[in-house]
């Protein structure tokens, strides 16, 4: 019996040691920062939310170039290192894209976004390998551009060898000037990777850095507590969830795309009738969907439009708002008014904004719903590359 207990405790220790933990910090989104300064994000960026998802999906297995979303509503970031010794960068761990990029020391002096962030210096790394392939991701009316380089990428205790990444020498628009993060680390499938670069997690898998080829997100929605969240590579942590995971298969291995059976606003409105496709996206704060359906949802919860595509409700009504439910894989996931309404302070006043926004993603990629942090904050989410599935459990 003693030997059995010893084996059990050894296995538990191995499981804990095998998990790579990356603390996540929550920051005020770019949209909120711009709004606080009296600027309209849409005016400054001349951008379209759907750019990232406006993709074609060819019959072949050739990589599909993606276009960068604007990250106006990204809220969580963590730290990685590039090079030897590691040069620190803060990045959005984004399940809605597949490339890693950071600003380059060789960026233009006129690139204000670059000047305000950490920059990769290949000359200070003993493991740098030159590549030089042109790297560009379309971004609104301009493009984020630079070239590929190869170096060691450090995430927590993991050192990923020979990781290709983009050194950005040009970052368009105001978004990245206001950003609290330096770059993006994409965690979606290789199919949407620009230049066919192997995503970081694919290299983690091929180099056998984790025991299980899964990663999971805990996103803390309480603004008054720390940490902001945690990304775990190699498994899940029961301290962040209750009950069991319910899994649903990935329907298209590009984004983390799944099938949603139906949605409902209380008993007064049905959405996604007959089923619909959705992306689980850690790099998006809100829940988005086809504008016609989202407009009906906003009406059902008594929300009225603001000038930036956002909707607001009377804060006094939040406790009595209808529950919004999502049926996925036969399992019902619910969000209460307190969970899908975002309370923000602007000019000393508290506003209650809807956590839903209309977004029309054209075919062949769309139409799509996007389950961002408003959803993931309530349901601890695991992304399983071994079984190509996504799992949800109630977050603590």
Curated annotation (Swiss-Prot):
This is Cathepsin D. Its main location: other. GO terms for molecular function: aspartic-type endopeptidase activity. GO terms for cellular component: lysosome. SUPFAM superfamilies: Acid proteases. Belongs to the peptidase A1 family. Residues 76-393 form the Peptidase A1 domain. The active site is at residues 94, 281. It is an enzyme of class 3 (hydrolase). GO terms for biological process: proteolysis. It comes from Chionodraco hamatus. Optimum pH is 3.0.
């Amino acid at each position: 019996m003693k030997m059995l207990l010893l084996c059990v405790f050894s296995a538990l220790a191995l499981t804990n040691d095998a998990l790579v933990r990356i603390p996540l910090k929550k920051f005020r989104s770019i949209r909120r920062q711009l709004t606080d300064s009296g600027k309209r994000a849409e005016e400054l960026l001349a951008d379209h939310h759907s750019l990232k998802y406006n993709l074609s999906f060819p019959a072949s297995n050739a990589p599909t170039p993606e276009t960068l979303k604007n990250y106006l509503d990204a809220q969580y970031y963590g730290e990685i290192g590039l090079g030897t010794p590691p040069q620190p960068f803060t990045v959005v761990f984004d399940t809605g894209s597949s490339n890693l990029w950071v600003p380059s020391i060789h960026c233009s002096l006129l690139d204000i976004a670059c000047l305000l962030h950490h920059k990769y210096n290949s000359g200070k790394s003993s493991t740098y390998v030159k590549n030089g392939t042109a790297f560009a991701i379309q971004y609104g009316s301009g493009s984020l551009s630079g070239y590929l380089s190869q170096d060691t990428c450090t995430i927590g205790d993991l050192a990923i060898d020979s990781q290709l990444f983009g050194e950005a020498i040009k970052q368009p628009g105001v978004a990245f000037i206001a950003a609290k993060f330096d770059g993006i680390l994409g965690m979606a499938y290789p199919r949407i990777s620009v230049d066919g670069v192997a995503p970081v997690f694919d290299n983690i898998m091929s180099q056998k850095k984790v025991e299980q080829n899964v990663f999971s997100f805990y996103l803390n929605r309480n603004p008054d507590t720390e940490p902001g969240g945690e990304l775990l590579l190699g498994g899940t942590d029961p301290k962040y969830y209750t009950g069991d995971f319910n899994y649903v298969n990935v329907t298209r291995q590009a984004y983390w795309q799944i099938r949603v059976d139906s949605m409902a606003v209380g008993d007064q409105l049905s959405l996604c009738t007959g089923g619909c496709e959705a992306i689980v996206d850690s790099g998006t704060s809100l829940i988005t969907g086809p504008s016609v359906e989202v407009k009906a949802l906003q009406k059902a919860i008594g929300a009225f439009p603001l000038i930036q595509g956002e909707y607001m409700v009377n804060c006094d009504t939040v406790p009595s708002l209808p529950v919004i439910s999502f049926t996925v894989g036969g399992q019902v996931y619910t969000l209460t008014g307190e969970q899908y309404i975002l309370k923000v302070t602007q000019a000393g006043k508290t506003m209650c904004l809807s956590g839903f926004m209309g977004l029309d993603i054209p075919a062949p990629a769309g139409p799509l719903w996007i389950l961002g942090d408003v959803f993931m904050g309530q349901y601890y989410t695991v992304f399983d590359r071994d079984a190509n599935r996504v799992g949800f459990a109630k977050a603590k």
